[in-house]
Structure formats: structure tokens, C-alpha cells
Amino acid sequence: MELSDLIEVTRVRDAFMRKGPRPAQIGDICIFEEFWLLHKAVDRVLCEPISKENPQRGGLLALKCKNFLLIIFEIGDLEICRATARTIEALSNINGFLHDYAFFYNSPFTILDDGWSAFDPEQEFARLMLSTDAFRISSVNEKFSVCPSYPEKLIVPKGIGDDYLKISATFRESGRFPVLSYFHKETRSPLVRCSQPLIGPTNRRCREDETILNSLITINRGYIIDTRSKSSATSAKAKGGGAEPQGNYRQWRYIQCPIPRQREIHDALTRMVDVCSERKVTSDRWVSRVGQAGWLSAVAASLEAAANVAQCIYSEGLKEVPVVIHGGDGLDSTLIASSLSQILLDSDARTIRGFESVIEREWICAGHPFSLRNNHCAYAEGTVTGPFESPVFLVFLDAVHQMISQYPMSFEFDENFLIFLFEHAYASEFGSFLGNSEKEKKEHGIRKKTVSLWSHVHHPENMKQFVNVCYDPTTGVIWPSIAPQCIKIWDRLFFRWQRPDNSWSKPETETIQSLADHWKLREKELTAKASSLRRNVIELSRELRVSSPI
């Protein structure tokens, strides 16, 4: 079908924008050839008469967008209003991404730093080699022959041959065998991610997979972090999946750090957006509904899982403690935990380029299916939606926002950068978030035919809008609190379109400097206190182990 077949109306003249990102005004609605709102940014389209008693008054066209923006137009002719609604609905729900604007976008700025080559895996490996020689680059997945959701080049344990990797892939969900995600220089502890083992009801075993994991062990036992609940892991075993049996993985401790599943996250966001748009409700009832929505719980669970990973890697007095993370298919909660833990552990991941590198490695190249997950957001319902849609990446961004709220001086970027990434993950003129894997990017020539989002960000004129002027680089680990009173609603995300623009304006330079000085002092005090408390906990744990009877 041609795009022209979907277009019933090309332009609607003299429409009145009653509600939107601009002051109320009369103008034309252009379906194409003008760039104001991408078709893909529209999540749901509604059309109804202005007056049911008098249809001659025209219709109301409501566009509910994926970034929670609501736009309402008054159109004088009800039939034209309905035709416009059908057109926008069709264009915003085209299957696939080959007609997305990114393929037709011509960059208005000179690309000074090509984002497509900014995070080359071989460069990443070269930096890793400065810290350890225990790993190598493998081309076992050349032409995506072993695992379609992995990139072609992967970092794996040095002593493991490609034949073992191939066998392990048959034992792991979707072929996602263990690969290096991160290496902590100070403790020399590797972070590895994969998918669940396919042990099934018969307790199937794979000695090659056991060998791969055991090759990571040097002087201390490792940890396997499962991001599923106990019931989910048990249910998975009945369906052919499961978790590593202690008898076969004797050198590993198994820990469960559950993060909500895709559908739970999707429903939580829908409820959260609904609560945040509610006006006629008492404050007590509103607070109760926020808790019942489950969104903040999902963010807190993600932070808790990441903190547990970081705690295993950064155990005081212990070195070389390998950590393996997996959930089910390794495409969602696994990536949340692996990426957030790196931000906790590594100050470089809290810079703009370092954060981009985490997203590129742990989300885009790691195979998070952006096109499937972000096809719709919180408003869409009915037949246009699919079972694979879930705002998993937004949970990650909100968790980072919670870190910034608690450590406002430790990040080179501010929440504007996070919101920018959220919007472009759902609808963008750039190609970075297109497709579901590197395999799809290569098949459709996305890296050749589109502009990278990072090329836009790296331009000096663009980057300055994301810089945190209060940034004070710190090299230490950060430990955000997950206490309920510390996990806050992301105002700028959920209420951005409900407040006047000037309420979000940045304070004056003197005010910023005063706040910066205050938060620097406060952060140092809290960091020192947190370190002291952690030492006390470790000492108490050791005393308990010594005093406990054998």
C-alpha cells in the first residue's frame, strides 16, 4: 500500500487549536510537508462532535502523544474532522519503521562528530585491555548467525573458544550466551549478562556453559543475579527455561532481585499518566492512587536490583568478584540492571558521552527491541496496540532521574537530556533508536541512510542545553536511597504540559551558584555518612558470621 492511499485529507484550514504546546490560535493543520509533530509521536487519535445536539458546529480532534502532550483542535466541519482523524490514525500506526521520517530527514547542521562511529566496539575493547587481558573480541556472531539480537562482535572470556560459545547459545534463551557488559577497574570484577538457561523440567545441563561461567572465577565465588521473581523463574522452568541449579554452578551464589515484567510496567505507566492528569481528587486520594499505579515501585525495584549488582562488585575488602545478570530473554530487566549498576559504579557513565556509551552498548547494540517496545506508549488501546509494547527504557531513564535528584552534582547532564532521550526513543528524525537489533539496522541500512542522534547531541550548540552547570566530577560510587520517601514523581516528565512554560525556566546564575555550593557541601556530608554506615554494616555482618555456630 502506498502512503497516499492512507491520506484522505492533506490540509485543514482555519482549525482552532484549543489546547497544545502553544497559545490557543487559529491556523492550518498540515498532514505532511511541514515539520511540527511527527506522525509517530501520536499515540492515540480521538474525534467527537463539539455538540452532540448540534453536529453542524463541527468536531473536536484530540491527539494524545507519546510524550504525554495533549493537543485539541476545533474543526468547523465534522466530516473533515473525522477524515483528518482517520488519516492521522493510519499514518501514526504504519507497521514497521521503513516509512519513518528518519529515512527522509536532511540534517540542517554540519556533522562534526559522527555518532555512528563514536562508540566502536574495538575502541571499547582497546580501553578494556588497559585494565585486563582476561577477555577477547569474538566474531562468533558474524552475520548474526548464532544470536540475532546480539551484535556481530562481542567481548568474551579469553580462554573460551567460539565452539563453546555456540553450544552455550543453544542452552540460553534466544541464543544470548554470556558476554562481558562491564569491567570494574578498582576491584577487577567483571559484569556479564546473558539470558536464562534452558534447563526445563528435566534439569537439562550444559557443561560448556558451566565452563564459560567458571572461567570468570579467580579468587572469590561469583554471583548470579536473576531479575525475575521466584514465581516467574519457577513458571519459566515449566516452560523450558529456569535458573542455574546450585549443584551444577557450585562456585556461584544465586540472588533474586525482581524487576516488574513488561506488561506490569506498561500498565503501571498507563495508570501513572492517568493519575497525573486527574484534577478532581483529594490530595490523600491522589497520593494513594500514585502508590497503587505501581510506576514508582517499578523504578525503585530497578534501582534496588542495580544497587545489589553494584554491592556485589564493590564489596569492601573483596576483589575479583564476577557477577552475571539475567532475567528471561535478557532484553529488558537484564539491561535495566546492567546499565544502572554501571552508572552507580563508574563516574564516567555519569558524563554525557559516558552515558551515551552505556545506552549504545547496553540498550541499542545489546538488542533491546525499541521498535517493538516503543510502538505505543500510555494512551493507545485497542487493536493498534501489541503484546510486546512496554516503556522499559523509560523505567531506566526515570531511575537515572532519581539518581540525579539525590546526587545533583554528580552528573554532567540534567533531566532535560533524559526527557530528550525519552522523546526520541518513541519518535525521532534520527535513526539511533530505529529497529529491534543491530541485525535489523544492518539489513535496512539504518546507519548509512539516517543520521545518528549522537551526531546531533555532540554538536556544541546542541550539547550546551543538556549540560548540568552544577556538575562537580566525583570518582566514587554513588548509593541512591530507595526508601519510599526518596523515590519522587518525575515532575518535569509527567506534568510538563500542565504547567506554564515559565514555571520550568532555569534560575539566574547567582542562584545556581548558591544552590551548587549548598548541594556540594550536602552531598559530601551524605556521602561520608553513607560510607560510614556501609562500613558498619559490613563489620556487623562479619561479626555475625564469626559468632554464628557452624
Feature locations, PLM:
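Cys-dependent protein tyrosine phosphatase-like superfamily
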Residues: 1-323, 339-550
